[in-house]
Curated annotation (Swiss-Prot):
PANTHER family: METHIONINE--TRNA LIGASE, MITOCHONDRIAL, METHIONYL-TRNA SYNTHETASE. Is required not only for elongation of protein synthesis but also for the initiation of all mRNA translation through initiator tRNA(fMet) aminoacylation. A motif ('HIGH' region) lies at residues 15-25. It is an enzyme of class 6 (ligase). ATP binds at residue 313. Its main location: cytoplasm. It comes from Listeria monocytogenes serovar 1/2a (strain ATCC BAA-679 / EGD-e). GO terms for molecular function: ATP binding; methionine-tRNA ligase activity; tRNA binding. This is Methionine--tRNA ligase.
Amino acid sequence: MPEEKNTFYITTPIYYPSGKAHIGHAYTTVAGDAMARYKRLKGYDVFYLTGTDEHGQKIQAKAKERGISEQEYVDEIAEGFQELWKKLEISNTDFIRTTQDRHKTSVEKIFEQLLEQGDIYLGEYEGWYSVSDEEYFTETQLEEVYKDENGKVIGGKAPSGNEVELVKEESYFFRMSKYADRLVEYYNSHPEFILPESRKNEMINNFIKPGLEDLAVSRTTFDWGIKVPGNPKHVVYVWIDALSNYITALGYNTDNDTKFQKYWPADVQIVGKEIVRFHTIYWPIMLMALDLPLPKMVFGHGWILMKDGKMSKSKGNVVDPYMLIDRYGLDALRYYLLREVPFGSDGLFTPEDFVDRVNFDLANDLGNLLNRTVAMINKYFDGEIPAYQGNVTEFDQILVDFKNNVVKEYEGSMDHMQFSVALNQLWSLISRTNKYIDETAPWALAKDEDKRTELASVMTHLAENLRIIAVLLQPFLTRTPGEIFLQLGLQEENLKKWDSIYGYGEIPAGTTVVKKGTPIFPRLDAEVEVTYIQDEMKGSAPAPAEEVAEVEALETPQIGIEDFDKIDLRVAEVKQVDKVKKADKLLCFQLDLGEGKLRQVLSGIAEFYQPEELIGKKVIVVSNLKPVKLRGLMSEGMILSGEKDGKLSVIEASSALPNGAKVK
């Protein structure tokens, strides 16, 4: 018999299909996916649930506006959510819909049980009702009230800003107050039940201490929902209908409840902060009434906001996840969502930050590390990773110790749902590995045959760190880890598993890297892409930059010899090269053109060369180019480079040519 795995059950809220899925839905679901993938990586039997809440007055009204049935409407919207999950490569185990028979049958049984127990009773309700929120409010809860000339309240706005109307109807009620003390006791004995901690204080102080009122759990003002057993003029309201999905999806109250017995209670339920109250008051009280164990944790995350507040079409600030994936790749979006915003807090989406994350974190830090490593293994060892030897250079053990510490910190952060912290720790390992290249200077070691052992050690440490980085990236990015494994020539599945990160030097000697690595994240033109995203948010994006560039390439004009003669090409010797602060593409050259003084030229090749590699080379310079200022530095010329597959290579002149020789 195979050893039984530890289980892990994680859920997102079921989304209300009143419109197109947006980046907020993507954020919650990608976060859940990262946690599910992390636990699978560690060997857990994971059940990841998401879905749609498909009943209610608002949906009934939307379907009527469209002239279609409610079922046709929710089928269409639910399909849109499932398409987005596929696009995001969400690894959910199941997708529950509240219109499915498996859900409806179980909900009917739950309602009957609570009614028979006396936890639900029939009464009458009068209050201020918001159709948009599908919730009743007392007069004191209203954000704004409207009064007539006699001072009588005649309307108002809910805390959400939506209009309310006075509604009186017969309703079934749930005796919430019966369980209030027991719930607070549970909070106190289970400190991790509500996270972050601030959410728990909010629930106690704002909702429980003032006194829990009995909760209306049925409606008669609309009929698109699950009929109350024995009283079909009532439909079961969202508090029982939607919240119970977390157990109905597992087969609760059915003849086949194997999954329920195996996975319940949930380990983590991820929800947006606006619905924490429903999941930490209504939901646990319902479970107490059913005599079922409560979830181990409800994590209320913040919102992704824009500079001008929440996303809305009227503000022209809606971010379409499909657009970001199609233009920049899935991993760029997944990385940004989980790195930019501390999970549990609100965060801002800006096009500038998104492009910077792609360029600096993904293309520069991670992409360049892979490119340089593969290129050096090809150059110095004919593409074969040498046998591992530990502690050869003075920096080797420092790097290994740093890795061990990062793994420990990363694991702690992931266990506490701190995704941005875990990614920050992982990027510190990427930065430390890049620093290791600068410290060991493999291009210098390669010039000394006596340093061959040290050079081999550097290559194995770089490859091994990249392997471990790829393993740790697997919860977050779905495609990049596989590309790193591919470029490093790693085929053994054991090298991609979680347990492999605790050791070191696991890559077999002679493993062959790819001959020519391709950039896993091409750099973006920041100005062009920021403008593109802004225009897309407003609904008026220009043609993609790639298409424009392709047309321009086909229409390059021909020139006469008289035009070419205007260009003064000279041989120059590189005397000094420095990186330019806050400009990761630029290098600042001091060149000898035989003029009796050095000339300063800036070139955008920093991602392809270390400064030390270029000193002493003879290069070709356009010497009569009009001087320009870049990043506050004057550039007096242009160094010629060739381009292939997105990589630039400096065109070198013969060492026999004197400095300043004219190139014809």
